[in-house]
């Protein structure tokens, strides 16, 4: 059997396939798509942003950092993976540095201890040796003296007003105002008595008025009811006065007083 020379290519040594490198594995020229480069490149994202450069090597591939022996054909993943600073979701070396700084600061804060303050706080007191003295301002001292003087004068006024021991401070001042009015009216009556009853025998009337006005209980009753003591003889003399007769209201009040048995 004669083999034609044209068929001798079946016995020719086939070329040995070379391993494809990462940059040649996906090359369009391998499949005869060179004339489609301008077509599919428009649909692919920018390599600068999303596809890392295979020659960019961020990690150190020294044997000291590798715990296991890695075959050469697996370096495709190692060499092609790198951090993309433009991708917000990819990790960055700065994030590891910030995390280490935060952990260091947090550990320092956890070691901080607040000073131990006393739970008691005293205002206006100072400690000098074993004794404690209160610090007072000039205004506080003046106010304390003023309150002390008011208290002393109030106690002295209460001794002069009949029945003041039965009242509180406000009621005592009200009773004091009425008592002052009673004294003023009683003094005017006594002065008028001296001018109107000079010709009458007023010795008996004078003794009776002295007895009445000398009693604390009677003074309290008179000042509370806002009235004063007037002798009957003096009222009868005033009734005949022309100024009283010309004033119907005063004349009516005098007749009312004379009709009662309260006045002597």
From Swiss-Prot:
InterPro entries: bHLH95_bHLH, bHLH_dom, HLH_DNA-bd_sf, IND-like. GO terms for molecular function: DNA binding; DNA-binding transcription factor activity; protein dimerization activity. Residues 134-183 form the bHLH domain. GO terms for biological process: regulation of DNA-templated transcription. Keywords: DNA-binding, Nucleus, Transcription, Transcription regulation. Expressed constitutively in roots, leaves, stems, and flowers. It is found in: Nucleus. GO terms for cellular component: nucleus. Pfam families: HLH. Homodimer. This is Transcription factor bHLH52. The lineage of its organism: Eukaryota, Viridiplantae, Streptophyta, Embryophyta, Tracheophyta. The gene is BHLH52.
């Amino acid at each position: 059997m004669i083999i034609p020379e044209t068929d001798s290519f079946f016995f020719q040594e086939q070329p040995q396939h070379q391993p494809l490198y990462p940059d040649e594995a996906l090359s369009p020229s391998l499949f005869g798509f060179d004339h489609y480069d301008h077509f599919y490149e428009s649909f692919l994202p920018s390599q600068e942003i999303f596809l890392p450069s295979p020659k960019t090597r961020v990690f150190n591939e020294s044997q000291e950092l590798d715990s296991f022996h890695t075959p050469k054909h697996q370096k495709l993943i190692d060499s092609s993976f790198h951090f993309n600073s433009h991708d917000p979701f990819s990790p960055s070396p700065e994030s590891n540095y910030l995390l280490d700084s935060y952990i260091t600061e947090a550990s320092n804060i956890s070691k901080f201890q607040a000073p131990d303050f006393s739970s008691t706080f005293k205002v206006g007191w100072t400690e000098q040796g074993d004794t404690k003295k209160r610090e007072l301002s000039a205004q506080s001292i003046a106010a304390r003296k003023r309150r002390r003087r008011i208290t002393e004068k109030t106690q002295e006024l209460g001794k002069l007003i009949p029945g003041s021991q039965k009242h509180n401070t406000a009621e005592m001042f009200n009773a004091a105002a009425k008592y002052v009015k009673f004294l003023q009216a009683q003094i005017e009556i006594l002065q008028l008595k001296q001018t109107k009853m000079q010709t009458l025998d007023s010795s008996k009337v004078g003794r009776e008025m002295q007895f009445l006005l000398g009693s604390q209980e009677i003074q309290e009753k008179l000042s509370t009811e806002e009235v004063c003591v007037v002798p009957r003889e003096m009222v009868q003399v005033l009734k005949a006065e022309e100024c009283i007769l010309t004033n119907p209201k005063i004349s009516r009040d005098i007749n009312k007083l004379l009709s009662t048995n309260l006045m002597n």
